[in-house]
């Protein structure tokens, strides 16, 4: 489980999204307000951002609230596309840098908020870690992000107890799924935020319904039901 956040829009400082808000990921690492599973997210953190078309990452298995080095540098890290997460490790999963989101295939950054039975996922050398989220990320990368909705539906059918909230970015797109946990959206004048929970009390935040796929591009926001019978919205 984790709390994650994505940004697509104008160039902004990483700190303005992750550290500065009154209920940003720094605070969510020890006092989340809407987390359904787990009490805090102290098993690591990661920030990914795009330098042109190149994804860059800074990850740590330590709690975000105590990382003074990151706090001092984050105001200088700026990007138009950012993906960040704080982690609450699934019981039995390793606490290490390689198990900490965001994961990458060299083009996309990806975070998973939830849990999945590794037995329903194909094992392969592409996974960054043996943890469930890393193996799920490798599976999603192998099928392609354009097929994210189909992949989540299939994995969810194979493991009915899975929680499969995904957030991914490639520099020009944000894609997210809701499958068992919360996701909120904020449309700002300078861009769009997708987040596990609001980072402040702005009245513009809205909730994304469960079992939906959200895509954010420069053209706008698209919301599609993962239940085929509901169709696009």
Swiss-Prot record:
Enzyme class (EC, first level): hydrolase
Residue stretches in coiled coil: none
Superkingdom assignment: Bacteria
Active site: 2 (nucleophile)
UniProt xrefs under InterPro entries: EgtC, EgtC-like, EgtC_Actinobacteria, Gamma-glu_amide_hydrolase, GATase_2_dom, Ntn_hydrolases_N
PROSITE patterns on file: GATASE_TYPE_2 (PS51278)
Pathway: Amino-acid biosynthesis; ergothioneine biosynthesis
NCBIfam families linked: ergothioneine biosynthesis protein EgtC
Name under which the protein is recorded: Gamma-glutamyl-hercynylcysteine sulfoxide hydrolase
Organism: Mycobacterium tuberculosis (strain ATCC 25618 / H37Rv)
């Amino acid at each position: 489980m984790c709390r994650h956040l994505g940004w697509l829009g104008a160039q902004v400082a990483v700190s303005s999204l992750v550290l500065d808000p009154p209920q940003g990921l720094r605070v969510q690492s020890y006092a989340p307000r809407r987390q359904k599973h787990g009490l805090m997210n102290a098993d690591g953190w990661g920030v990914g951002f795009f330098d042109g078309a190149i994804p860059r990452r800074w990850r740590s298995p330590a709690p975000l609230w105590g990382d003074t080095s990151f706090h001092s540098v984050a105001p200088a890290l700026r990007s138009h596309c950012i993906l960040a997460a704080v982690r609450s490790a699934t019981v039995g999963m390793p606490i290490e840098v390689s198990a900490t989101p965001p994961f990458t295939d060299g083009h996309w950054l990806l975070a998973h908020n939830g849990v999945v039975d590794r037995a329903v996922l194909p094992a392969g050398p592409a996974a960054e870690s043996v943890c469930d989220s890393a193996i799920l990320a490798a599976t999603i990368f192998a099928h392609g992000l354009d097929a994210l909705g189909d992949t989540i539906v299939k994995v969810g059918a194979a493991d009915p107890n899975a929680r499969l909230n995904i957030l991914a970015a490639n520099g020009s797109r944000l894609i997210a799924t809701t499958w068992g946990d919360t996701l909120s959206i904020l449309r700002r004048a300078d861009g769009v935020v997708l987040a596990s929970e609001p980072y402040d009390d702005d009245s513009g935040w809205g909730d994304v319904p469960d079992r939906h796929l959200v895509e954010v591009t420069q053209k706008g926001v698209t919301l599609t039901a993962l239940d085929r019978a509901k169709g696009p919205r």
